[in-house]
């Protein structure tokens, strides 16, 4: 087989449908838009959530809750992720960022206790869950709140 002999597999290439090109094309006259009305016009159509003038669902349901402006979003790291580091390493938020464990520091790092830690590490983070703190100290390491 040569380059000039290559052919697309059957049914993979579909010809585009040219509308408004005569009645015999099957898409002439109104170009598949039906007769008149909002949806037949250029730029026509209703906005998402519009229900024909009836009170929309999102407005019929009650408002709930609020957004807390003081919310802190911590970057989460689990114990099993820390096993990738060598024994005795001092783990800091900067190290986690540059090794790609976390993509953003957000409001800080929180260490959670999912998985098991098999290495003795010194972990410096902004928050620790009780189980994570216990597991780090059981493995012979230290947990330090920044």
From Swiss-Prot:
It holds the Pfam family Ribosomal_L27A. One of its GO terms (cellular component) is cytosolic large ribosomal subunit. The keyword RNA-binding applies. The keyword Ribosomal protein applies. Residues 1-18 have a biased composition (Basic and acidic residues). Residues 1-58 are annotated as: Disordered. InterPro entries: Ribosomal_uL15 (IPR030878), Ribosomal_uL15/eL18 (IPR021131), Ribosomal_uL15/eL18_sf (IPR036227), Ribosomal_uL15_bac-type (IPR005749), Ribosomal_uL15_CS (IPR001196). Keywords: Ribonucleoprotein, Ribosomal protein, RNA-binding, rRNA-binding. Coiled coil: none annotated. GO terms for biological process: translation. Residues 42-52 have a biased composition (Gly residues). It comes from the Bacteria. Part of the 50S ribosomal subunit. Belongs to the universal ribosomal protein uL15 family. Binds to the 23S rRNA. This is Large ribosomal subunit protein uL15. It comes from Oceanobacillus iheyensis (strain DSM 14371 / CIP 107618 / JCM 11309 / KCTC 3954 / HTE831). The gene is rplO.
């Amino acid at each position: 087989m040569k380059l000039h002999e290559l052919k697309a597999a059957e049914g993979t290439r579909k010809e585009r449908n040219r509308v408004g090109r005569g009645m015999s094309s099957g898409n002439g006259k109104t170009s598949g838009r039906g007769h008149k009305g909002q949806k037949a016009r250029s730029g026509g159509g209703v906005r998402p959530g519009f229900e024909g003038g009836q009170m929309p669902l999102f407005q019929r349901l009650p408002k709930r809750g609020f957004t807390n402006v003081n919310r802190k979003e911590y970057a989460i790291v689990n114990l099993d992720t820390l096993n990738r580091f060598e024994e005795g390493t001092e783990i800091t938020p900067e190290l986690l960022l540059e090794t790609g464990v976390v993509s953003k520091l957000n409001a800080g790092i929180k260490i959670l206790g999912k998985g098991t830690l098999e290495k003795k590490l010194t972990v410096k983070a902004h928050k620790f869950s009780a189980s994570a703190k216990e597991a780090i100290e059981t493995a012979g390491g230290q947990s330090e709140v920044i």
